[in-house]
Amino acid sequence: MSAKKPLALVILDGYGYREDTASNAIANAKTPVMDALIANNPNTLISASGMDVGLPDGQMGNSEVGHTNIGAGRVVYQDLTRITKSIADGEFAETAALVEAIDSAVKAEKAVHIMGLMSPGGVHSHEDHIYAAVEMAAARGAEKIYLHCFLDGRDTPPRSAENSLQRFQDLFAKLGKGRVASLVGRYYAMDRDNNWDRVQVAYDLLTQAKAEFTAETAVAGLEAAYAREENDEFVKATAIKAEGQEDAIMQDGDAVIFMNYRADRARQITRAFVPAFDGFERAVFPAINFVMLTQYAADIPLAIAFPPASLENTYGEWLSKQGQTQLRISETEKYAHVTFFFNGGIENEFEGEERQLVASPKVATYDMQPEMSSPELTEKMVAAIKSGKYDTIICNYPNADMVGHTGVYEAAEQAIEALDESVGKVVEAIKEVSGQMLITADHGNAEMMIDPETGGVHTAHTNLPVPLIYVGDKAVEFKEGGKLSDLAPTMLSLAGLEIPAEMSGEVLVK
């Protein structure tokens, strides 16, 4: 069997590009290898943050999201952005599970109940999504629209719910129908530690309007809670109804839409609406059409508006189907990223996939050993390239990220210099076997070690672009405006392989 000429992808974790050289460990370190590559080889900058990787606009990238996008060859939207995007595109209003639940309630002249964590926190839910759900129910003809507000105060300031509640009171006034029907703190409605007595408080409020307190409006109910010294998170069960209004309880034939997208704190209260349940004794158990916004658990037999997106034909799976061999190699710190996350959340190896793990150094913080285990990793990487065994090699060097996180500037420069030396050896090996290589990063970090706004130490990732450099014999010219999800199609193109239909990323080679 003839020796293979591998295509390598080297991911320099946390190696972003920033024009300003102030507190920029990447620009200021001595990097003869990278300098020569950028001077002489095809290169460009690509985006690794925000909507380009499926995160909210302007949000910095991270390693999990970066590797998932690289391996998928398509933008993988996180739940928050996926749902926000569906609202903007008009798809949300046509989501089958929501349409069916609302229409069945409207037809039977029943109520549509919408519940969820009412805040702009964006961790478990977003009030913009809840707003869209209320508008959708109204547009589809629901007359009774009841909003059950779980109050936040953890992912938002402790007393910040008033603006959100006022916003929805105004919406219902504009619609001329519907109302905020109940308030309760997330401490009760969103427990995740099997404190079923707390969950029962929320369940009884929803199904019986059983509440310690009542108020005529949501804002009045909140003010009363503050007067009792209850912050948002701990607001006791409060039924909202003005004089002459009926109780807004969940009854047979009603639709219930739970607008939290994060599963861990949505599971328990949801399980209380499933027949097989032993968390507490239910005084009533209405036959409702319950819709979960996302899948809270695989064993909850309820409708799901946004089922999990399964990633078919990721880069690793596709290579395996083509009978190709591949190696994933990194230090402990980023091993999961080049394996599990790169494979779209699949733990097991694909056929033809091998993995090599190099132990990260046992130090308290990596500024104490900025080169980390790059010499050992490089030795294994060079041996793998020269072995002739692999069609593709995916390697991650963690230094720029892990040392960047320490905030120690001198150590970050040393980390970049150690990386440069390693990259030089890998480039030599690739050239020796007439292979090809792309050098890139999953997000930025070490290019900004001082926060320009505050003047304090900057230890976080950045939302800056990352380099993409080609090493090899092909006459390559890169397109501008690429992003991480374009890397897999580009690599398949460089290897002369077909690109699967699921990969919507672009080939960045002209």
Swiss-Prot record:
Mn(2+) 2 binds at residues 13, 63, 442-443. NCBIfam families: pgm_bpd_ind, PRK05434.1-5. Its cofactor is Mn(2+). Binds 2 manganese ions per subunit. The keyword Isomerase applies. This is 2,3-bisphosphoglycerate-independent phosphoglycerate mutase. It holds the Pfam family iPGM_N. Catalyzes the interconversion of 2-phosphoglycerate and 3-phosphoglycerate. The gene is gpmI. Keywords: Glycolysis, Isomerase, Manganese, Metal-binding. Its EC number is 5.4.2.12. Substrate binds at residues 124, 154-155, 186, 192, 262-265, 334. Monomer. It catalyses: (2R)-2-phosphoglycerate = (2R)-3-phosphoglycerate. It comes from Vibrio campbellii (strain ATCC BAA-1116). InterPro entries: Alkaline_phosphatase_core_sf, BPG-indep_PGM_N, Metalloenzyme, PGAM_B_sf, Pgm_bpd_ind.
